[in-house]
Amino acid sequence: MDFTNRTARCRLYLSDSLLVNKICKDIQAHLYEKFSPSTIAERLKMNYSYLSRHFKQETGKTITEFINEVKIKEGTRLLETTEMPLIQISTQLGFSSQNYFQTVFKKITGVTPIEYRTKT
């Protein structure tokens, strides 16, 4: 299943659970920040273990996987619509390094950010 289909599939789950909706809205609201699932739990004033377990049961993926997919989706948009250097995109999206951004990007999309940019 390609990257676009996986993100679309996750969106299907959003209407099934109020808590999943809250988590996804929080991720979108803080997309350009460095944060973790435990940060989301703190912001939602919820137990981290419960939050993680519920999200995984409802969506079939971890909160971290979903965060990375949303950030990489935004990364693809930035690669398509801007000339921003990779280091700036990775920093803007809250990745700890350009290398980590590239690793996550390739894992999710199947190509490197440079390959993606040259194809679009």
Spans of model-derived segments:
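Residues within well-formed alpha-helices
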Residues: 15, 22, 74, 88-89, ...
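Short, Lys/Arg-enriched, Trp-marked, Pro/Gly-tolerant hinge/linker segments that flank
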Residues: 1-25, 29, 38-44, 57-65, ...
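…primarily DNA-binding HTH/wHTH and HhH modules…
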Residues: 103-120
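Short hydrophobic/aromatic patch on the recognition helix
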Residues: 51, 55, 100-101, 105
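Residues within the alpha-helical elements of helix-turn-helix
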Residues: 43, 92-93, 108
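Terminal helix-turn-helix DNA-binding modules in bacterial transcription factors
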Residues: 24-25, 29, 34, 57-96, ...
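Residues within helix-turn-helix
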Residues: 38, 49, 85-88, 98-99, ...
